[in-house]
Amino acid sequence: MKNNAFGKEKGWIELIYGPMFAGKSEELLRKLKRLDYADVIYQVFKPKIDTRTKNKIMSRDGRNMDSFEFDNPYEIFDKLLSLEVNPHVVAIDEAQFADESIVDVCQALADSGYIVYVSALDKNFKNEPFMVTAKIACIAEYVEKLSAICTDCGAPGTATQRIINDKPSNYDEPVVQIGNYETYTVKCRHHHKIPGKPFPEEIKKFKSDLRNLLKNKENK
């Protein structure tokens, strides 16, 4: 391997996150392909629950790379210890599907000298944070947040919208549902809809009072 920063005993975490269709896996693949030019050895992982591509991570433009699938994040340790050649970089795609032990795994890997690339959704279809991703963002040295395009207005799409029978999913539906274009789209904050989402009375009152205030000003 060429003499570069990846060959030194330094570890860190880089997180790529955002909504669906923002190019997270594509960016992860780009970063990994770039390592090939410097002969940097890497190993790719993803949670087994992601059944869209078996033993591969794949971008929506068709690029892909072999990966090791795990049920328990601690299996990452076992896989690394079994390899004949120890990698310098560990990449984890779709990390939001892992349980919260993935946070400790990423921390331990970086502490042990690995460079850790993580790709994950930032929020679920309810527009609420995936806590796994939020915690990784707190411990990562480098964080890159991507956005997509709102399919209604073309503004930055930052919220993943789940669609069932051509309608937005209700708030009380299960968080995890594996899908692609047939199930999900992306909206901006103003076009994202979550039927049945509860709001504190204080927020309801503020929004109502603000609407009335603005309406009264328009009528003057």
Swiss-Prot record:
The keyword Transit peptide does not apply. GO terms for molecular function: ATP binding; thymidine kinase activity; zinc ion binding. It is found in: Cytoplasm. Keywords: ATP-binding, Cytoplasm, DNA synthesis, Kinase, Metal-binding, Nucleotide-binding, Transferase, Zinc. SUPFAM superfamilies: Glucocorticoid receptor-like (DNA-binding domain), P-loop containing nucleoside triphosphate hydrolases. Its EC number is 2.7.1.21. The keyword Ribosomal protein does not apply. It catalyses: thymidine + ATP = dTMP + ADP + H(+). The active site is at residue 94. InterPro entries: P-loop_NTPase, Thymidine_kinase, Thymidine_kinase_CS. One of its GO terms (cellular component) is cytosol. It is an enzyme of class 2 (transferase). ATP binds at residues 18-25, 93-96. Zn(2+) binds at residues 150, 153, 188, 191. GO terms for biological process: DNA biosynthetic process; thymidine metabolic process. PANTHER family: THYMIDINE KINASE, THYMIDINE KINASE, CYTOSOLIC. Belongs to the thymidine kinase family. Homotetramer. This is Thymidine kinase.
